Regions:
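Beta-propeller blade termini and top-face loops
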Residues: 33-186
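Extended acidic/polar, glycine-enriched regions
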Residues: 1-28
């Protein structure tokens, strides 16, 4: 009797593929507000200050590691702990910067690039394309756009930055290849 129950799968509504691929409720509905500061215009440029959050509701350590911008001026910020944030209010005044967590759990993201409105992230183990399928401001699907076959646990083995060329190719810098070590990325 017990054996037959173990072999018969139960039907669950959550097993429906369409249900699983249409997004879901917000996981991080909170936003964080900071204030930026305009820099003095000297010569050809000014250095503005974008203040990062002092703390978050998730108590994560906020160490910025990547930055890019949407065409509408919103900023995308990655942090070393695995988060991707979207920052609104990056304008001429910088009076109200609104930080919204877009994705979490990425493996040491060190580069981010917005292409055609989609966010791509360079992680230690892959290039990830983030999808917000229900347009609620959070990534619902993390697509492995390109997996890295040379992943090291070495602390200094990072995949830095993320750039594209006019043909749509992606480029990043991979450290740790100038040694004689048998450990990849060491």
């Amino acid at each position: 009797m017990l054996e037959s129950r173990l072999n018969e799968p139960e039907a669950h509504a959550e097993d429906d593929f369409a249900t699983l691929t249409t997004g879901g409720p917000l996981r991080w509905p909170e936003t964080i507000k900071t204030v930026g500061y305009r820099g003095l215009e000297q010569g050809g440029y000014a250095l503005d200050t974008i203040t990062i959050p002092d703390s978050t509701p998730w108590n994560n350590w906020f160490r910025t590691s990547a930055i890019d911008f949407f065409d509408d001026g919103r900023m995308v910020v990655g942090n070393y702990g695995g988060d991707i944030w979207i920052v609104s209010g990056v304008d001429d005044d910088l009076l109200t910067l609104i930080w919204k967590r877009f994705a979490a759990g990425l493996y040491e993201p060190m580069g981010v690039r917005v292409v055609d409105g989609r966010i791509y992230v360079t992680c230690k183990d892959r290039l990830t394309r983030l999808h917000d399928v229900d347009n609620n401001g959070e990534a619902d699907f993390y697509e492995s756009f390109s997996a890295d076959d040379d992943v090291s646990v070495n602390f200094h083995a990072f995949n830095f930055d993320l750039q594209t060329d006019n043909e749509g190719n992606f480029y990043y810098a991979k450290s740790g290849h100038g040694t004689d070590s048998d450990v990849p990325g060491a």
